[in-house]
């Protein structure tokens, strides 16, 4: 009987989200095998609707916990004309599908694993020739389920826990009553042991989950601390480089200053003797002299121009302060400006003549 | 050998005129600065400025051949007198005269808007008296009146007439074109128009003159 489309759609969505998980909750399967894993599971559920794909935490024998895909449910076991359902869990280990999955018979509370069984260990682990001869990529889950069903039909692995029979009457044959006590004792001990083991496993699993959470938090803290330290190291390195560069710059400046000091020292030594020859009554106005008459005239005109400018500026201040009447102010501004023009125009003319003279001398020099 | 600025009488006359032009421009610059700094009265400024402008126009006319461009002249002799050049060359009248002309222009346009407002008030009130109470008849009149009131800058933003007209326009815009004002609404609108008109006349400056 094919499963209803709604269920298949739901299983599709579940598998898609599970297999595309990223980060810490990602499933540990090789990326290139995920599509095959999906196909195997979908084919299995199509043929055996009593099985459901799930994700759960699997604890390896060495203590590692890992989240894996599993197919959980029952497999039909036809036996003596009646079809029974054997509860199983098919774990897809990290190495699946290159290596076979791990199959456990998962008895309910009122079921007991047959001891001994040719295919099922006391802990429920199933061993089959099909599993031992697993070949990638031809081996698959549908064939596995078929082999499980056939093997279980030949030799059922589970039976119900029966209530203790009524007290045997003495009249019943002694052969029948003799084996009862050891079976009863074995059954009870087995159940208790299994329950104890289950409880211990659950406790250990819970503890491991808590420890894992604590370790993850601790690890994240250490990782952030590491990134802080790395950033600080970078800052210190940059600061150190800057200081080295600054030191080099300062050393260069020091060299320049030392050189300049030497130059000035030399100049002082050369000119120290000349100071004695200077006249005491040095005339400042004669210290500098114009090279020719045009330059002298230029100097005069410029000086007069600027002098008038200063006078006008002073008059501006006087007028602003109110110590100079407006009509006087404006009349004097006009008179001084008129005089200033003559000086400015003369300077302009001298400049033109000097320029012409320069051009002529350059031309003469080139010609000669 | 020193350089002489001029070599003959004609050349000397030219430089004398140049000096006078230079002095006028400089003096005008100082005058503008004094007026701006409020160091002289407007009348004092106007008198002196008129004199300088007349001197400048007379002199520049006679120097037209030698000084075709005043800006070039100012640049040649390194004068920083932009205010004077504007006053003498571009404006041609004292600042007081220039600004008074601008104020007059503003006043004349204001007068025309006032006349427009009065006309719109009277038209609106007369239309209501003639029993023109349909929305498509009343709305354009109130719209024109509101627009002209808004154009008048002497009225305050919260002027009674502006607010009332805005309210009525809003009310009319919610009615259909063929809808008519009730007798009560028509009387209320006429009352609002009349009181707004009275407030408007009271707000006009020198209404009594």
Swiss-Prot record, chain A:
InterPro entries: ESCRT-I_UEV_domain, ESCRT_assembly_dom, SB_dom, UBQ-conjugating_enzyme/RWD, UEV_N
Pfam families xrefs: UEV (PF05743), Vps23_core (PF09454)
GO CC list: ESCRT I complex
PROSITE patterns: SB, UEV
Subcellular location: Endosome; Prevacuolar compartment
Domain UEV: start-end pairs: 18-162
Keywords per UniProt: Coiled coil, Endosome, Protein transport, Transport
A single BP term in Gene Ontology: protein transport
The SB domain, residue ranges: 292-360
UniProt subunit comment: Component of the endosomal sorting required for transport complex I (ESCRT-I), composed of ELC, VPS28 and VPS37. Interacts with FREE1. Interacts with TOL9/TOM1D.
PANTHER family listed in its UniProt record: TUMOR SUPPRESSOR PROTEIN 101, TUMOR SUSCEPTIBILITY GENE 101 PROTEIN-RELATED
Function: Component of the ESCRT-I complex (endosomal sorting complex required for transport I), a regulator of vesicular trafficking process. Required for the sorting of endocytic ubiquitinated cargos into multivesicular bodies (MVBs).
Protein name: Protein ELC-like
Taxonomic source organism: Arabidopsis thaliana
Record lineage: Eukaryota, Viridiplantae, Streptophyta, Embryophyta, Tracheophyta
From Swiss-Prot, chain B:
BP-aspect Gene Ontology terms: endosome transport via multivesicular body sorting pathway; protein transport
Top-level taxon of the source organism: Eukaryota
Key words, A-Z: Endosome, Protein transport, Transport
Main localization of the protein described in the UniProt heading: other
One Pfam family here: VPS28
PROSITE patterns for this protein: VPS28_C (PS51310), VPS28_N (PS51313)
GO cellular component, one term: cytosol
Domain called VPS28 C-terminal: residue spans: 109-205
Record has Protein transport as a keyword: yes
Cell compartments where the protein resides: Endosome
Entry-linked InterPro entries: ESCRT_assembly_dom, Vps28, VPS28_C, VPS28_C_sf, VPS28_N, VPS28_N_sf
Domain VPS28 N-terminal per the UniProt entry, residue ranges: 1-99
Subunit organization: Component of the endosomal sorting required for transport complex I (ESCRT-I), composed of ELC, VPS28 and VPS37. Interacts with ELC.
Similarity-based family: Belongs to the VPS28 family.
Function: Component of the ESCRT-I complex (endosomal sorting complex required for transport I), a regulator of vesicular trafficking process. Required for the sorting of endocytic ubiquitinated cargos into multivesicular bodies (MVBs). Mediates the association to the ESCRT-0 complex.
Name the UniProt record assigns to this protein: Vacuolar protein sorting-associated protein 28 homolog 1
Organism placement in taxonomy: Eukaryota, Viridiplantae, Streptophyta, Embryophyta, Tracheophyta
């Amino acid at each position: 009987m094919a499963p209803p489309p709604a269920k298949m759609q739901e299983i599709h969505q579940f598998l898609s989200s599970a297999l595309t998980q990223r980060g810490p909750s990602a499933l540990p399967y090789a990326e290139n095998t995920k599509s095959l894993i999906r196909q195997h599971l979908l084919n299995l559920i199509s043929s055996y609707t009593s099985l459901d794909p799930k994700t759960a935490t699997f604890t390896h024998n060495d203590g590692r916990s890992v989240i894996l895909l599993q197919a959980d449910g029952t497999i039909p076991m036809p036996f003596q004309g009646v079809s029974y359902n054997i509860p199983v869990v098919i774990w897809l280990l990290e190495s699946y599908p290159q290596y076979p999955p791990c199959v456990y018979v998962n008895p309910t509370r009122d079921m007991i694993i047959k001891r001994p069984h040719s295919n099922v260990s006391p802990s429920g682990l199933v061993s089959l020739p099909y599993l031992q001869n697993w070949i990638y990529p031809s081996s698959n889950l549908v064939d596995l389920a078929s082999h499980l069903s056939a093997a279980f039909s030949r030799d059922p692995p589970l039976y119900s826990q029966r209530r203790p029979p009524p007290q045997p009457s003495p009249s019943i044959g002694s052969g029948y009553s003799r084996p009862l006590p050891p079976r009863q004792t074995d059954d009870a001990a087995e159940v208790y042991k299994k329950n104890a083991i289950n409880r211990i496993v659950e406790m250990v699993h819970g503890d491991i989950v808590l420890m894992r959470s604590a370790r993850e938090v601790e690890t994240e803290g250490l990782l952030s601390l590491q990134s802080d330290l790395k950033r600080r190291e970078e800052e210190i390195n940059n600061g150190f480089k800057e200081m080295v560069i600054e030191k080099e710059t300062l050393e260069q400046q020091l060299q320049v200053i030392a050189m300049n000091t030497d130059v000035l020292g030399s100049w002082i030594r050369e000119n120290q003797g000349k100071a004695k020859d200077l006249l005491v009554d040095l005339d400042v106005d004669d210290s500098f002299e114009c090279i020719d008459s045009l330059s002298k005239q230029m100097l005069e005109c410029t000086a007069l121009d600027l002098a008038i400018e200063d006078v006008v500026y002073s008059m501006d201040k006087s007028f602003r302060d109110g110590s100079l009447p407006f009509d006087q102010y404006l009349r004097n501004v006009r008179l001084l400006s008129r005089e200033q023009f003559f000086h400015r125009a003369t300077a302009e003319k001298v400049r033109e003549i000097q320029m012409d003279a320069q051009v002529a001398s350059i031309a003469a020099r080139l010609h000669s | 050998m020193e350089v002489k600025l001029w070599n003959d009488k004609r050349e000397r006359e030219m430089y004398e005129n140049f000096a006078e032009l230079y002095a006028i421009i400089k003096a005008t610059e100082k005058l503008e600065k004094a007026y701006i700094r409020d160091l002289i009265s407007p009348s004092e400024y106007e008198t002196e400025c008129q004199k300088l402008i007349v001197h400048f126009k007379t002199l520049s006319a006679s120097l037209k051949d030698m000084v075709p461009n005043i800006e070039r002249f100012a640049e040649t002799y390194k004068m920083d007198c932009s205010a004077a050049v504007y006053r003498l060359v571009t404006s041609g009248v004292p600042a007081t005269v220039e600004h008074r002309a601008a104020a007059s222009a503003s006043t004349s346009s204001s007068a025309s808007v006032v006349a427009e407002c009065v006309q719109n008030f009277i038209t609106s009130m007369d239309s209501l008296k003639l029993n023109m109470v349909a929305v498509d008849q009343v709305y354009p009149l109130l719209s024109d009146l509101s627009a002209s009131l808004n154009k008048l800058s002497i009225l305050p933003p919260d002027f009674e007439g502006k607010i009332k007209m805005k309210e009525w326009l809003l009310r009319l815009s919610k009615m259909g074109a063929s809808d008519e004002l009730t007798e009560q609404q028509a009387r209320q609108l006429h009352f609002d128009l009349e009181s707004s008109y009275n407030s408007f006349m009271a707000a006009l400056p020198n209404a009594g003159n």
